[in-house]
């Protein structure tokens, strides 16, 4: 028979008592009252913060947006099909944040910064809040460096600077996304990180943009944030802020970034859907009262940082879609008043074969020539003036048959200048090529050519100057000025190419 030793038993009990560790955690919980349409009403969650993340029993995450006296309105960041009435919800104590790192370059992610391109996880050691405060007045400096888009019409007459916010506005199918993607392609070798945010787009359109960027080697310096049309409204609403957080990460590390929001009309619609389902009072066009704040707090995050903060920059190109050219609708007027200028794309010009279909008359950049190199300023002033005069004359000439020679010449010059602004998609031009093209047009070298020959001649001229007069490009890129020497080289090249072209 086994003898029971009391001292052994007391030792074991003592050890167990010493090892016992009583941990008490306080969790803020609640109960689901109602769920549907991407919204859940929760009873409880007494100490939840506005914008705090909450976790449902089956793993779905939501954001507490409405804090009412007897319940909390939560928007779901998932379909929420498994959430049941009466199930428990716990507050996480966190505000929405995403991991950030260099490893995101070249990847396609969703609004929660999870990869959706099937190329595995992305490792990141740091994280940033999705909603961060914008830099203050002291943290900024005025915009002074150009951000070249590669499109002559924009870089010469509506210049964009690093740290500027320039709205791209127009009807559907007028080439808004094409202007934005061409700008991304033109940043190759410019040391600019690009972020393209697709909000509520068709998955096929996003795939097309990604393929186009991959084929031209632009994905190396680009991050694509995509929430397609079938995504929950909460994720479509968050996507632009996720893109801004990623761009900010690079901006505060003394780098230049470009962010494109395609498009903010769809984000406003997603936010309107969420607000109406949360029973917030509707305002103009049924948008909630704070839809201006929705966009202003996003676009104010674009900045040119001061020298103390490393002179990084974030340039924003928000896109807004208009309905049959109505620029005075609610969202377009809001975003126009927040941004530093707008590029207006016209369906009529697009259908008339003028592409990019930029209406130069009502497009404007409020930064202006501060964001241009000296060489471009030297040639662009004359171009702007001549095109404005041409637009007036053209309207007048429709009513008059017998025009004097000077007017006919001015009309002919204007038509050739308009031809010179046309560009194929995905064919951005360097600033040297643009200066040379504008100089050729404004100094009358194209006047002797048929309108149909202008683009062919300009393509040949660019090739000719690149191979036979490389010093022109060297002078412009080193001095940023159209020096008398560069001008004489250019004149010589144009004359030689004109003679060759007319002999063909």
From Swiss-Prot:
GO molecular function, one term: ATP binding
Site, Required for activity: residue positions: 363
GO CC list: chloroplast thylakoid membrane; proton-transporting ATP synthase complex
Catalyzed reaction equations: ATP + H2O + 4 H(+)(in) = ADP + phosphate + 5 H(+)(out)
EC number, UniProt record: 7.1.2.2
Top EC class, one word: translocase
Lipid bilayer topology: Peripheral membrane protein
InterPro entries the UniProt entry points to: ATP_synth_asu-like_sf, ATP_synth_asu_C, ATP_synth_asu_C_sf, ATP_synth_F1_a_nt-bd_dom, ATP_synth_F1_asu, ATPase_a/bsu_AS, ATPase_F1/V1/A1_a/bsu_N, ATPase_F1/V1/A1_a/bsu_N_sf
Binding site for ATP: 170-177
Keyword annotations: ATP synthesis, ATP-binding, CF(1), Chloroplast, Hydrogen ion transport, Ion transport, Membrane, Nucleotide-binding, Phosphoprotein, Plastid, Thylakoid, Translocase, Transport
Keyword Plastid applies: yes
Biological function: Produces ATP from ADP in the presence of a proton gradient across the membrane. The alpha chain is a regulatory subunit.
Family to which the UniProt record says this protein belongs: Belongs to the ATPase alpha/beta chains family.
PANTHER family, sorted: ATP SYNTHASE SUBUNIT ALPHA, MITOCHONDRIAL
SUBUNIT field: F-type ATPases have 2 components, CF(1) - the catalytic core - and CF(0) - the membrane proton channel. CF(1) has five subunits: alpha(3), beta(3), gamma(1), delta(1), epsilon(1). CF(0) has four main subunits: a, b, b' and c.
Descriptive protein name: ATP synthase subunit alpha, chloroplastic
Species whose genome carries this gene: Nasturtium officinale (Watercress)
